[in-house]
């Protein structure tokens, strides 16, 4: 970045002093968190241990779409895919259809999704040590966690 300042002046008042816009301003962001409960986590595993390919993803998403089930999070590895969805009375029908496509399906109810934007080290450490975490997705700006619901 060249960090060239931008000088601004008013068109309506040509005698007024202008302002300078530079890239020296440090941006600060508030940390915020969202929480979603009443979520079901499905772990899909190909029985023949082949890799999840694009065609399989298309079939999976079509099944969820046909039952109008909202997908909240997708996490995949070479042979497994985890899909967190809203709880629905259609979920058992979806599980049956997924199994009919050659998938082994594990259904885990009573999970929650926590998304934290603009986290700091303290928040990261707090959630890094949580033994209830099933899935954790970390990027420089956010953390998404799927964990067993904690009942107080």
Residues of each region from the PLM?
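C-terminal catalytic "cap/lid" subdomain
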Residues: 1-152
């Amino acid at each position: 970045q060249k960090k060239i300042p931008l000088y601004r002046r008013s068109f309506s008042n040509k005698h007024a002093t202008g302002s300078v816009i530079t890239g020296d301003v440090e941006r600060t962001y508030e940390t915020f968190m969202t929480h979603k409960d009443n979520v079901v986590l499905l772990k899909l595993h190909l029985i023949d241990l082949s890799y999840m390919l694009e065609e399989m993803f298309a079939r999976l998403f079509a099944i969820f779409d046909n039952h109008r089930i909202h997908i909240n999070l997708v996490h995949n590895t070479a042979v497994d895919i985890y899909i967190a969805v809203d709880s629905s009375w259609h979920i058992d029908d979806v599980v049956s259809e997924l199994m009919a496509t050659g998938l082994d399906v594990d259904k885990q109810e009573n999970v929650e999704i926590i998304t934290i934007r603009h986290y700091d080290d303290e928040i990261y450490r707090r959630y890094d040590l949580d033994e209830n975490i099933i899935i954790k997705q970390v990027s420089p700006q956010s953390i998404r966690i799927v964990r067993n619901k904690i009942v107080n």
